[in-house]
Swiss-Prot record:
Species classification: Bacteria, Pseudomonadati, Pseudomonadota, Gammaproteobacteria, Enterobacterales
Gene name of this polypeptide: pagP
General function of this protein: Transfers a fatty acid residue from the sn-1 position of a phospholipid to the N-linked hydroxyfatty acid chain on the proximal unit of lipid A or its precursors.
Protein name: Lipid A acyltransferase PagP
GO cellular component: a single term: cell outer membrane
First and last residue of the signal peptide: 1-23
Organism annotation: Erwinia tasmaniensis (strain DSM 17950 / CFBP 7177 / CIP 109463 / NCPPB 4357 / Et1/99)
Length: 189
């Protein structure tokens, strides 16, 4: 009996030790990610390389996830405007801080502001052509949610030439809610 208790104690100690090492590794990874994120935001804010104009271009409600009577009522022309600042890091990746307002699906004003990051590729011999893939983290407010601030974390993709970039995201959702492709033009000055 005593031997079994000692074995259980040793096994539990080893298991907890491994768990502690995994937890420490996870916490280290989270801390590194947060430090990288906050450093990028700070550098973009303190050392912008360009000023940006944002012009919303298209909103598309995924036809496979909406009833046609809902789609017929929605606005898919999100006119509006916004501004921001951009910084390209030492790896050539885009970092941006932005604020934009546009007409949402219900034709009501929706502001959004935040930080965006994209890994940038220049796959052609022409260095002006670029592709990007990344994320945006920010806050938006909608009329149908009484303009309560809503945090957002969304994917970003882009294609551009020189100072003009067509940037886009997809807002996931459920049936008749979310599942919206949203795109805008971004000009850097």
């Amino acid at each position: 009996m005593r031997l079994k208790l000692i074995l259980y104690f040793l096994i539990l100690s080893c298991y907890l030790g491994i768990g502690s090492a995994r937890a420490a590794t996870l916490m280290h990874g989270v801390a590194n990610t947060w430090n990288s994120f906050s450093d990028n935001v700070s550098q973009t804010w303190n050392d912008p390389q360009t000023f940006d104009l944002y012009v919303p271009a298209v909103t598309w409600h995924n036809r496979w996830t909406y009833d046609s009577d809902k789609i017929d009522k929605y606005n898919e022309r999100p006119w509006g405007a916004g501004g921001g600042i951009s910084h390209y890091d030492e790896k050539g990746n885009w970092n941006g801080i932005y604020l934009m307002a546009f007409k949402d699906s219900f034709n009501k004003w929706e502001p959004i502001g935040g930080y965006g990051w994209e890994k940038t590729w220049r796959p052609l011999a022409d260095p002006d052509f670029h592709l990007g893939l990344g994320y945006t983290a920010g806050v938006t407010m909608r009329d149908n949610w009484n303009y309560i601030p809503i945090p957002v974390l969304l994917p970003l993709a882009s294609i551009g030439y020189g100072s003009a970039t067509f940037q886009m995201t997809y807002i996931p959702g459920t049936y008749n809610n979310g599942n919206v492709y949203f795109a805008w033009l971004r000009w850097q000055f």
